[in-house]
Amino acid sequence: MNITQTFYDNMASKYDKLFQDWQATTQEQAEILDRLFREYGYNHTAHILDCACGIGTQAIGLAALGYAVTASDISDRELAEARERAAQNGVQIRFAHADFCALSDAFAEQFDIVIAMDNALPHMLTAQTLSTAVKSIVGRLKADGIFVASIRDYDSLLTNRPPYSPPY
């Protein structure tokens, strides 16, 4: 188990506390992503892979909007939390344990959209690991697919010191 897995396994039961209102955030982020997907010509028939799903924040919201969602994560505990939350929200999501640096080990199919939200990519600490991750992600996209990631602007957060920062 690597340090990232250990960190997120330990955070799984507390991760929702990072949000002012986790349930509202799932809906809010899904609506933002839905608007973005529609700008690129996708609708609810798109098949989405959330390759760093954590506790399901984006996957659950997108599934609630009617998208076909597959969700994976490196943390077994976060996946367990995501499965439980998906059931509580009455949504169907296919879950799998996967490292987003090796997605082809878990998935043979390609997706219309792949997302890696909530600052997943900065865990790639070298140019080599980032390159491996991006190649893995692009390898799971259909030819006309899109990849969406979110990365926090920590410089702005340190400068402005807001009392709360939405995770997007």
Where are these regions (language model features)?
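Class I SAM-dependent methyltransferase SAM/SAH-binding core
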Residues: L49, T57-L103
